[in-house]
Amino acid sequence: MAETVRVVVDAMGGDNAPAEPVKAAVEAVTEREDIIVILTGRQDVIENELSKFQNYPKERIQIVNTSEVIETAEPPVLAIRKKKDSSIVVGLNLVKKQEAEAFVSSGSSGAILVGGQVIVGRSKGVQRPPLAPLIPTQKGVSLLIDCGANVDARPEHLVQFAKMGSIYMEDVVGIKNPRVAIVNIGAEEEKGNALVKETFPLLKECPGINFIGSIEARDIPAGYADVIVCEAFVGNVILKLYEGLGSTFMKMIKTGLMKDTRSKVGALLVKPAIKETLKTFDASEYGGAPLLGLKGLVVKTHGSARAVEIRHAIFQCVQFRQQKINEKIAAHMVEETTGKEA
């Protein structure tokens, strides 16, 4: 029998809370029997949302009442310290105390990043936990690491990102010997800023990863690499541009297919193929971005996430747990640290 995974969902985080997180929780426990969802937030508000649903396994949704909410504009470090009874802090503490295996939130990115490191804690040997979302490509998906957690990363941090990303892609996505590339302004080794130039030789010499060199932004959608390594500023720009282009592309296609009678007739013929193609550009299909290298599972979804994205993030947590991703990353980093000490 499969292990039951307890996933905390921040019911108060995001633009569409509490309706969408609660809906996601109901859908998740209805679809799968190996999940218990713990909703953190104001109990009366959550119960009111739950009352809108019927015929779901109520015994697998729990509520932990909290009295505070961390807003997006609040300074993250101060908010984590001051708002001990917030839905984010309480949820992360449940993971820390091993009363849950994972935490999912659409709330304040800064608070989740700070709280993940301060409350849940980094695995031994991990210097900087990166945010690592999957992005669609012509060949499937690639992992973009880091996309927002470490703006001032150093070369050794990027090397660790490459290692963690390789473990993720091999064990979660199932890609053997995943290709690792560093984002650069050209394919040549001598190109790039100081960070890229210092990191490149370290990645070349790094055992255990399949480093293929630099990748330019235009080649990312083609799927030339499985693990895309960069510091957070670059990664976040790539991610936001990717999502913006995907959204615009979908709107343009829909508008073009509806502009006249001839186009509408043609649309009926190609609708199934277009629908399937457009689905691959929908960020909600890929769940959230895990904060890798922690002692517990923490996944950040978009602030505007709907139930479908949050539900997929919950399922993501189950897969992470089953594949023991955190344990594998921790073991690799401890092995690396021990090797250096020796």
Report residues per predicted region.
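Short, glycine-rich nucleotide/cofactor-binding loops
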Residues: 7-19, 149-159, 300-305
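N-terminal phosphate-binding or glycine-rich loops at protein starts, especially the Walker A/P-loop
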Residues: 1-47
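Glycine-rich phosphate/nucleotide-binding loop
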Residues: 117-144, 224-228, 232-341
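Glycine-rich phosphate/diphosphate-binding loop of Rossmann-like nucleotide-binding domains
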Residues: 18-20, 32, 36-38, 43-44, ...
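A short helix-to-beta-strand connector/capping loop
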Residues: 56-62, 207-209, 294-295
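Phosphate/nucleotide-donor binding subsite
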Residues: 55-100
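Short beta-strand segments
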Residues: 10, 39-40, 62-64, 105-107, ...
